[in-house]
Amino acid sequence: MSLVLQARRSGKYFLLIDNLLVVLGFFVVFPLISIRFVDQLGWAALIVGIALGLRQLLQQGLGIFGGAIADRVGAKPMIISGMLLRAAGFATMAVASEPWILWASCTLSALGGTLFDPPRTALVIKLTRPHERGRFYSLLMMQDSAGAVIGALIGSWLLAYDFHYVCWAGAALFVLAAAWNAWLLPAYRISTIRAPVREGMLRVVRDRRFLTYVLTLTGYYMLAVQVMLMLPIMVNDIAGGPGAVKWMYAIEAALSLTLLYPIARWSEKRFRLEQRLMFGLLLMTLSLFPLGLSTTLQSLFALICCFYLGSIIAEPARETLSASLADARARGSYMGFSRLGLALGGALGYTGGGWMYDMGRSMNMPELPWALLGIIGMLTLALLYWQFSLQVPCATHQPRSS
């Protein structure tokens, strides 16, 4: 086996373990924020929505800067410092007794993610070949789902004792992830050239196709982030307690572990990336319209299953399509900027979702926020169809970056 092949293989194993630690650390804490501050402390959903939206907007919106710096200095120092900063954010959240403290903790967490997320994503592109990238993304997403339910189970168990333990567990996992990277991650360069930070950023913003694609995904992310805000609140309301929330993530894990990889392999041979992304988004959108009318856990979980299935179809295609559009000369910058749609969609989805949920409750119209989200999904589908119809379809197996 050549040294290059050996490095790729060991690198992929490293990425899987690193990803598991990051996912566990995140999902121990974040799914329980809305339950802790809305249901247990009685804060308005809007306040918590602002905190979650602020985290999303800062982390993903500033990602291009983190990616551009990583293009210049390499992945390792950015990843380690970012993980330690997120650990500090979680430790601060443990003592959040006022909204501004919660917002500050989410800001620290966001800045940490700004540093470590783009170089980690760029490493996936560097260490995988184009033809295997989609399947590796599927493996990572399967791991995300399993890690999400395990993290939520750990967090729910710790929440029964004290929310402090939830935050400290999340912080400890990110410190462990930082130590893992400090010990084993080589000093990889994630781009083919070592260009100035400004040059990498300019290369991205001049790429009109990539820019349009990223901004169009804002609506997609407005739907996707409700897994962290409105869906847990609704499950909690119908069940009468937070214990059922872990089953929501268990459903996602079961579907992902059994269907994600087979669906990705089957569909990549038969459909273009654009078609897979749009069909998944359509399924997510259609599942939202009747969600507000659910009165039992059975009907609610059935619709959540449809939502997750749409995400299972769309996510590998979306991630692979983003990688295929990235320029290898500025991988970090491209992967950082690719999160801008998540930044905007997350901020709007969290703050708007919290506001719509409060509004629907005050007007005794629980279906209102879900209907509005469904309309947003339909508009996003129309924009994606228009964008893809004007461009040459992206090949499934031959991305530009390698």
From Swiss-Prot:
Gene from which the chain derives: mdtH
Homology family: Belongs to the major facilitator superfamily. DHA1 family. MdtH (TC 2.A.1.2.21) subfamily.
HAMAP family membership: MFS_MdtH
Protein name: Multidrug resistance protein MdtH
Domain of life: Bacteria
Pfam families reported in the protein's UniProt record: MFS_1 (PF07690)
InterPro entries recorded: MFS, MFS_dom, MFS_trans_sf, MFS_Transporters, Multidrug-R_MdtH
Species for this entry: Edwardsiella ictaluri (strain 93-146)
Membrane-crossing segments per the record: 13-33, 34-54, 99-116, 139-159, 165-185, 214-234, 244-264, 277-297, 340-360, 368-388
Signal peptide: none
Compartments, record wording: Cell inner membrane
Taxonomic classification: Bacteria, Pseudomonadati, Pseudomonadota, Gammaproteobacteria, Enterobacterales
